[in-house]
Design a protein with these regions (language model features):
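Aromatic- and Gly/Pro-enriched, solvent-exposed loop/edge beta-strand patches characteristic
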Residues: 205, 359-440
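Sec-dependent signal peptide cleavage junction
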Residues: 19-30
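N-terminal zymogen propeptides
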Residues: 28-69
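Extracytoplasmic soluble-region selector
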Residues: 476-539
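Bacterial N-terminal signal peptides
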Residues: 11-21
């Protein structure tokens, strides 16, 4: 008797779930040419950086000497060549160390400096088309690979599109007419979640916090003023001239409290130094590393970065340029970003907020199915939770439950500062006054709202138009097949975009499914295979 084919109709059903867990001899190569970025003045951040609630409180039992290199958390030294993108090399190295340290990548991970450099200055838009009109224009004759970057712009790029793998975007592309599409820009494997500015200057006052961040995450991002004649013959650097400018970015990967002050050409007053990973190749210093005195006055903009795997994540955002110099102060009022849902089968799982404040308490509210995008609260209050700004930088806030988003509707992320506290939030804004780089924002499709009395006012209008750096992070749930025809006795495997769930067949007399998603035809007819993870059911 001829076997009849079975057809499984798979349709996606999503319900709201609990929390989603997102998951010393100096050897200088005579041929090396140290390349730095254009000098920039440090801008002191007046906001106090440390706080008893910060994620990385320094502990008093830190050892006198530590090296992430010796512990296997640091990738190999690279050479930026003639390009001025030291910042990209430092950022990628810090990310690689974080991912290795936290078991999210192997020790041979290699992230693309070329991808980060190119898309910092060549925005192509985003998968939701919310930033398609935003442009960054490099006016410097050095071009995008040589113009350098403000360290505060680095965290913005890392949280906007993230980091790709070197294999897809090798560094050779930078000097060979690199180009790309929207799909390329967001073809990234890792995304920054939190960025914590430990200190903008005066690093001697923050030694314990810097050490703790290195110990926790493998390394930190930092900048200083490079001046060649201050490198000593013991892999050392100390500039006794008090500099308040920067021109080079590096990663700090360790420390030694007893590094002798006599190892420096110009002696500081005390022993102690940071172990620095550079980007001038292994021919510089001690296989690419050197020691910098704790007393180096130009050392600043020290950041600790956290990352997550960019696994089926979506980013709703309006801030398409990396303009680092705009922020908005909010007190006794609410702000909101309203987004239109343009994809199927998405759940809102987290919110990302850029802030120059720290320790500010606020209410976070999510409204869905808005009747009017110009009124962020004219919808269903899906969640409300009390939060506190943890970082000067980007703050990744996990929602207490996932929010199902319906294609074609609008949802709002509303932030309400508490107790009269001032929230100084990062913002994007058109600025064509800079010498090397100009930022142009397209506000035409944006709903960035400020509450004024009982009314909500669009912020993307008028002479002071701006865009709040508030992002909605979603997770898309999919199966590798939406239907299948299966003969009795045959098997095929279904694969879900989320692991850790359970499979179920609505009619086991027609088909069974095992714990690995293998579906086997048993009898004639139709049935539905359902997969459930963290309370989310799709089939």
């Amino acid at each position: 008797m001829k076997r009849r084919l079975l057809k499984f109709i798979l349709a996606l059903f999503v319900s709201i779930s609990p929390i989603l867990t997102i998951t010393n001899v100096l050897a200088i190569d005579e041929n090396y040419e140290p390349t730095v970025m254009p000098s920039r003045e440090y801008e002191h951040i007046d906001t106090p950086i440390t706080n008893s609630n910060t994620r990385s409180r320094a502990r008093s039992n830190l050892q006198a000497k530590y090296s992430s290199v010796d512990n296997g958390f640091v990738t190999g030294v690279k050479n930026q060549g003639s390009n001025g993108n030291c910042w990209a090399y430092a950022a990628c190295s810090v990310a690689e160390s974080y991912l290795i340290k936290h078991g999210m990548a192997s020790k041979n991970i290699d992230l693309s400096e070329a991808h980060l450099t190119y898309y910092m200055y060549n925005n192509t838009g985003d998968p939701y088309s919310n930033t398609d009109g935003d442009r960054t224009i490099v006016t410097s004759p050095k071009g995008y690979a040589g113009v350098g970057a403000d360290p505060r712009a680095v965290e913005l790029a890392l949280s906007t599109f993230g980091l790709a793998e070197e294999s897809g975007y090798p560094e050779s592309l930078l000097n060979n007419g690199m180009s790309g599409t929207k799909a390329d820009q967001y073809n990234t494997k890792y995304l920054l979640t939190n960025s914590k500015l430990i200190c903008s200057d005066n690093t001697q006052n923050y030694k314990d916090q810097i050490k703790q961040a290195i110990f926790d995450n493998g390394s930190v991002f930092a900048t200083y003023y490079d001046q060649g004649n201050y490198y000593g013959n013991k892999n050392s650097y100390y500039n006794p001239d008090k500099k308040n400018i920067l021109n080079h970015a590096i990663s700090i990967v360790g420390w030694d409290d007893n590094f002798d002050k006599t190892n420096f050409n110009s002696q500081p007053t005390e022993n102690g130094a940071w172990l620095i990973k550079n980007s001038w190749g292994p021919g510089f210093g001690d296989s690419g590393y050197f020691w910098m005195s704790y007393e180096e006055s130009s050392l600043g903009y020290v950041y600790s970065f956290d990352f997550t795997k960019n696994d089926h994540l979506g980013i709703y955002q309006y801030d398409g340029t990396q303009n680092p110099l705009c922020s908005a102060s909010i007190t006794y009022t609410n702000i909101a970003d309203v987004y239109k849902v343009t994809k199927d089968k998405e759940n809102l799982t987290a919110v990302s907020i850029g802030s120059k404040s720290i320790g500010v308490a606020y209410k976070l509210k999510i409204y869905t199915n808005l009747q009017d995008p110009n009124n962020p609260i004219a919808g269903t209050l899906a969640i409300e939770q009390e939060e506190t700004i943890q970082n000067v930088g980007m703050n990744y806030v996990q929602l207490n439950k996932e929010i199902s988003l319906q294609n074609g509707t609008y949802y709002a992320i509303v932030i309400e500062p508490r107790y009269g506290q001032q929230l100084n939030i990062f913002a994007d804004q058109t600025n064509t006054n800079f010498l090397d780089v100009q930022y142009q924002c397209d506000y035409s499709n944006e709903y960035c709202m400020l509450k004024n009395g009982n009314n909500w006012i669009k912020q993307g209008e008028g002479n002071n138009a701006l865009t709040y750096r508030i992002k909605g992070i979603t997770n898309k749930y999919t199966l590798n097949k939406t239907s299948m025809n299966l003969a009795v006795g045959n098997s095929e495997q279904l694969i879900a975009s989320r692991s850790g769930g359970s499979w179920r067949s609505t009619n086991t007399s027609i088909a069974t499914v095992d714990t690995n998603g293998n579906v086997k035809g048993v009898g004639h007819g139709k049935t539905t295979i359902t997969y459930t993870v963290n309370g989310i059911e799709f089939s």
